[in-house]
Regions:
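Nucleotide-activated chemistry modules centered on ATP-dependent adenylation/adenylyltransferase
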Residues: 1-246
Length: 246
């Protein structure tokens, strides 16, 4: 048992941040804190990671940042598939519900390689109000937040109380994942369009270069047209002056 490492899987989001802070405050064993950098995080997320590193230094801890050999964009546009029904195709394109290659290649496989040959217990930030994600966990996996009955809202509040704000990202997005994630809701994509124009232009360029469309129902250009129409409709719906006669 002495050789078993206790590994915190740290995404940088509210749940894994809360879990890490609580584990350290409770004096639990933490041997390694792993952050798998996809290279596609929001700028505020990288600032948050740096803030966390500064905070946990009081416990003598550091964040181990891991990266895949090839970048997200290389795999999306340049990698040649060597097997499967799309064998020989250049680039994986956008991830889909049936083929989330991005998560597998940039996170799961990277972490497994780092931990290969070690005996370890994985600590993952699954909140109490995510029971389906807690079901059927592996023998060497722990979900401390679930065990402590900490909900997602409570995890976020705990982080705020400790001074971690992500630059306001959680006021705009339910999930703070990669900024280009095709699984974002329409509301989140609307925020990206209106408040992050540089990232939106990058997203549009990536969609134009990809062999598959960003979403099944919309390309990024179609989303942009929709959001522009929404602004126009809202604008013409506002009366220019008060028509009521006093």
């Amino acid at each position: 048992m002495e050789n078993i490492k206790h590994i915190v899987q740290f995404s940088g989001g509210k749940d894994s941040t809360c879990m890490l802070l609580m584990m350290l405050e409770k004096g639990m064993q933490v041997d390694d804190i792993i952050f798998c950098d996809t290279g596609m995080e929001f700028p505020q997320m990288y600032e948050h990671i740096a803030q966390v590193e500064q905070y946990i230094s009081r416990y003598g801890k550091v964040v181990t940042t891991l990266k895949a050999e090839k970048s997200y964009e290389y795999m999306m546009f340049e990698h040649i598939k060597t097997k499967g029904k799309r064998q020989g195709q250049k680039g994986y394109g956008w991830g889909t519900m049936l083929a989330r290659w991005c998560t597998a290649y940039l996170k799961t496989q990277v972490a497994k390689r780092h931990l290969r040959g070690q005996e370890y217990i994985d600590y993952i930030g699954i909140a109490y109000d995510e029971p389906k994600r807690h079901e059927g966990i592996a023998e060497n996996v722990r979900h401390p937040l679930f065990d402590w009955h900490i909900t997602e809202a409570q995890a976020l509040s705990f982080c705020y109380e400790h001074g971690f704000t992500w630059g306001g990202l959680y006021q705009e997005f339910k999930r703070v994942s990669c900024w280009c994630c095709p699984f974002k809701s329409l509301d989140e994509l609307r925020v990206l369009y209106h408040k992050y124009p540089a990232l939106w232009e990058k997203l549009k360029d990536m969609d134009n270069r990809s062999w598959n469309q960003y979403r099944a129902d919309y390309s990024v250009e179609q989303l942009e047209e929709r959001f522009k129409q929404e602004v126009y409709i809202k604008k013409i719906s506002i009366p220019l002056f008060n028509d009521q006669v006093s």
